[in-house]
């Protein structure tokens, strides 16, 4: 299991975002995939930028958890699949008495997480753990809150992984799964070049790639993605589901536009042959900084997405 900062980034269970595209390829991609050789000095800032754009959603979700009448005092938090630690540090702010541990399989991202915690003044309650799940479940330690942001679906047996999380919870503790939601949209349906519906077709290609990734995971098992039922199956009490909206209308700020350009650049690379020649040509135009119809200049570029958080609680008895 690798990192997911936010992601970003669903036509199917997986959104077409750089976070997913990179993590899927890095951890599970076949040889020769252009995304398997990752420069974390390039990807790390992109992951941070994406998570920062979504920070308001994540903070709202964390405060929802903190305000639940059944919530125990949170003393230890595990952010599983933390990436560069944007959400980990946010959780440290929302739960000011808790130790927060960022868990990820990539040392370069954990170093970014640690540096971020230092900059934000939460390093005294912040730790990192390099771990690969499910092999390293026994190293995680117990927790009052386990945050799994778009990371569970990188484990072949999701039910067994949920049972593993349940076994780490202290009485009254909560698992927060960020899974599902709605696909990210950045362009109108008809952009005036190529066939209308470009992003929908990119989402379909991402869904195909996602299914291929899932099928190649060790111990992969198909599960109906009824998260409340899966919580109940592993002995947790479902505590509700909420979706949180990111809505940045046009015209975008410079940083948000830069992120859209960077994310679509990586999607163009990662989806590769799953796209038609016509759609690939349209993407080349969109990514050309000199093209007046491109992402660098279009007045209609926006950023709209919804992330869904599912909660399961361990009984206090």
For each feature predicted by the language model, list its residue ranges.
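Conserved Class I S-adenosyl-L-methionine
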Residues: 4, 221, 225, 237-317
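Class I SAM-dependent methyltransferase Rossmann-like catalytic core
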Residues: 37-59
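Conserved alpha-helix/loop element of class I SAM-dependent methyltransferases that forms part
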Residues: 55-73
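Class I SAM-dependent methyltransferase SAM/SAH-binding core
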Residues: 76-78, 86-136
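A short acidic, Gly/Pro-enriched loop at the edge of an enzyme's catalytic core
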Residues: 137-145
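A short SAM/SAH-binding and catalytic strip from SAM-dependent methyltransferases
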Residues: 144-159
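A short glycine-rich, Lys/Arg-flanked "PGG" loop and its adjoining helix->strand segment in the class I
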Residues: 160-171
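Conserved catalytic/acceptor-binding region of the Class I
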Residues: 176-252
């Amino acid at each position: 299991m690798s990192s997911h900062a936010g992601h970003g980034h669903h036509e199917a269970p997986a959104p077409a975002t750089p976070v997913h595209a990179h993590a899927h390829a890095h951890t599970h991609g076949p040889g020769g995939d252009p995304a398997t050789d990752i420069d974390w000095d390039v990807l790390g800032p992109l992951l941070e930028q994406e998570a920062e754009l979504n920070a308001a959603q994540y903070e709202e979700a964390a405060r929802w958890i903190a305000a639940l009448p059944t919530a125990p005092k949170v003393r230890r938090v595990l952010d599983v699949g933390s990436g560069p630690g944007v959400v980990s540090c946010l959780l440290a702010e929302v739960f000011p008495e808790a130790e927060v541990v960022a868990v990820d399989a990539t040392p370069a991202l954990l170093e970014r997480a640690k540096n971020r915690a230092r900059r934000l003044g939460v390093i005294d309650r912040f730790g990192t753990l390099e771990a690969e799940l499910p092999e390293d479940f026994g190293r995680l330690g117990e927790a009052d809150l386990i945050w799994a942001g778009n990371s569970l679906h990188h484990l072949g047996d999701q039910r067994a992984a949920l049972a593993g999380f349940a076994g780490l919870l202290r009485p009254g503790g909560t698992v927060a799964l960020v899974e599902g939601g709605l696909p990210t949209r950045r362009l109108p349906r008809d952009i005036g070049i190529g066939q209308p519906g470009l992003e929908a077709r990119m989402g379909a290609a991402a869904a195909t790639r996602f299914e291929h990734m899932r099928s190649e995971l060790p111990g992969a098992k198909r599960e109906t993605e009824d998260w409340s039922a899966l919580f109940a199956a592993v002995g947790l009490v479902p505590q509700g589901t909420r979706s949180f909206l990111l809505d940045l209308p046009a015209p975008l700020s410079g940083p948000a536009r830069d992120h859209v350009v960077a994310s679509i650049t990586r999607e163009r690379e990662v989806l590769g042959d799953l796209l038609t020649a016509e759609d690939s040509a349209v993407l080349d135009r969109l990514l050309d900084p000199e093209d007046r119809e491109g992402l660098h200049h279009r007045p209609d570029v926006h950023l709209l997405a919804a992330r869904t958080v599912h909660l399961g609680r361990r009984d206090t008895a």
